[in-house]
Amino acid sequence: MSKVLVLKSSILAGYSQSNQLSDYFVEQWREKHSADEITVRDLATNPIPVLDGELVGALRPSDAPLTPRQQEALALSDELIAELKAHDVIVIAAPMYNFNISTQLKNYFDLVARAGVTFRYTEKGPEGLVTGKKAIVITSRGGIHKDGPTDLVTPYLSTFLGFIGITDVKFVFAEGIAYGPEMAAKAQSDAKAAIDSIVAE
């Protein structure tokens, strides 16, 4: 039995293409892997605080007493990291906003990236500590950006996930959804076909 963590990060709720596709993924996965446990965390409806000068002090080893706000941030960081490490498959629904990921998803990453916990520095360079996972990124875009200079989502997510130790990453693209109903429908159809292929593996 595997444990699957689904991270939603769109601000558009039910109108979101990435949310719709991640819901489709969950439906298909449950149909094919009924014994697996699935956890869904919506980073828009349950937002993560923005990392600032006060909160970053909570995430670094220190003997200094923590403020109540720092204590809350550290507890949340511990919770998010424990959840991440407890799951085998990580599904990230990542819409493109202004060429990059949403603020909601970036805030999540800022709280799970902790030296000595999810990565460490060695004589040979950084080493990820969140290993043995598979990641599936479902990314939606209004335009066409894949393999082009305007796609900052794909390299960023590949780099971040690899940095913390998740190197088995597959991407599902839904592009051109702002180019009209026909193009949007094709984007959804192509993305669902890619999801079907991944689920069937």
Curated annotation (Swiss-Prot):
Q: Which UniProt keywords apply?
A: Flavoprotein, FMN, NAD, Oxidoreductase
Give the source's domain of life in one word: Bacteria
InterPro entries per UniProt? Flavodoxin_fold, Flavoprotein-like_sf, FMN-dep_NADH:Q_OxRdtase_AzoR1, NADH:quinone_OxRdtase_FMN_depd
Identify the residues that bind FMN: 10, 16-18, 96-99, 140-143
Q: How is the cofactor bound?
A: Binds 1 FMN per subunit.
The protein's annotated catalytic reaction(s) are: 2 a quinone + NADH + H(+) = 2 a 1,4-benzosemiquinone + NAD(+); N,N-dimethyl-1,4-phenylenediamine + anthranilate + 2 NAD(+) = 2-(4-dimethylaminophenyl)diazenylbenzoate + 2 NADH + 2 H(+)
UniProt KW Flavoprotein keyword: yes
Q: What is its EC number?
A: 1.6.5.-, 1.7.1.17
- What SUPFAM superfamilies does the database record attribute to this sequence? Flavoproteins
Q: Which cofactor does it need?
A: FMN
* GO MF: electron transfer activity; FMN binding; oxidoreductase activity, acting on NAD(P)H as acceptor; oxidoreductase activity, acting on NAD(P)H, quinone or similar compound as acceptor
Q: Does the record bear Chaperone in its keywords?
A: no
What Pfam families does the record point to? Flavodoxin_2 (PF02525)
Task: Report the sequence similarity comment from the record.
Answer: Belongs to the azoreductase type 1 family.
Q: How does it assemble?
A: Homodimer.
Write out the function statement from the record.
Quinone reductase that provides resistance to thiol-specific stress caused by electrophilic quinones. Also exhibits azoreductase activity. Catalyzes the reductive cleavage of the azo bond in aromatic azo compounds to the corresponding amines.
Checking PANTHER family in the record gives: FMN-DEPENDENT NADH-AZOREDUCTASE 1 (PTHR43741), FMN-DEPENDENT NADH:QUINONE OXIDOREDUCTASE (PTHR43741:SF2)
The entry's protein name is FMN-dependent NADH:quinone oxidoreductase
Gene encoding it? azoR
